[in-house]
A protein has these predicted regions:
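Short coil/turn motifs at helix boundaries and re-entrant loops, enriched in small/polar
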Residues: 23
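N-terminal signal peptide c-region/cleavage motif recognized by signal peptidases
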Residues: 26-29
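Compositionally biased, intrinsically disordered low-complexity segments enriched
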Residues: 1-17
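Extracytoplasmic copper-binding redox domains, predominantly the cupredoxin/blue-copper superfamily
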Residues: 31-231
Length: 231
């Protein structure tokens, strides 16, 4: 191989490596952090509200994806966790840890529960027998009508309520005890913010954020005070 050809190849490789490095650097610089604070009507932080971000660059993905499979337990006549967040198409495993039978019946949450045309899914889970493990049942949230929030209840025990939220956007999170949902490495540019909370029957107004290298914070205040959880 001639020296001229070697020089040409080396120059080409150097240019490629430089372009790759610049691309990675630009990608890093284009990532920003957005914190969304959710408050109730009285200005107190709200835990377990779902915050969904839709960035203008819809091809960008978070470093940590939403779980493709979750387990929801029925225990002490409660759904645990009370709110589950998954992507559309996720598998949800239901398990009854109580010694008596339970149902799982679903319907759209919010105002949709009053005029739902989709009956949702229904399951009957046998009670856990001493010395034997509970038998789980799986549901895949891949059908029309499961997008967004789904209310879960029990025919036998009317006080039982739980929710599963299926998000189309991969940028979604539940608020922590301080009422905060923190999104890192969001692509820069405009982003839509949607907040869902179980007791807010009418969705809160969507907000818009401008994501950049400078950390940003948006505050969303609900028009309700969520019911206190039963422990």
């Amino acid at each position: 191989m001639s020296k001229t050809m070697n020089k040409t190849m080396n120059k080409t490789m150097n240019k490629t490596m430089l372009a790759t490095a610049l691309s990675l650097l630009c990608g890093w610089a284009a990532a920003g952090t957005l914190t969304v604070a959710v408050l109730d009507k009285e200005g107190k932080p709200v835990i377990d509200a779902v915050v969904v971000i839709t960035p203008a660059n819809k091809s960008a993905l978070p470093k940590k994806a939403l779980p493709g499979q979750v387990t929801i337990a029925q225990e002490k006549m409660q759904f645990i966790p009370a709110v589950s967040l998954v992507p559309v198409g996720a598998k949800v495993q239901f398990i009854n840890n109580d010694p008596w039978d339970h149902h799982v019946r679903s319907s759209p949450a919010g105002m949709g529960q009053f005029n739902a045309t989709n009956a949702g899914f229904e399951l009957r889970l046998e009670g856990k027998t001493d010395g034997k493990p509970a038998k789980p049942t799986d549901i895949t949230l891949d059908k029309a009508g499961v997008l967004g929030a789904t209310l879960m209840g029990c025919f036998i025990h009317g006080s039982m309520r739980g929710y599963v939220y299926a998000s189309e956007s991969p940028w979604a999170a539940k608020t922590n005890a301080e009422g905060l949902a923190i999104f890192e490495d969001l692509p820069d540019g405009l982003a839509q913010i949607k907040v869902w909370q179980a007791d807010q029957l009418i969705d809160a107004l969507q907000q818009q954020a401008n994501v950049s290298a400078t950390p940003a914070k948006n505050t969303v205040q609900l028009s309700v005070v969520p019911r206190r959880r039963r422990v």
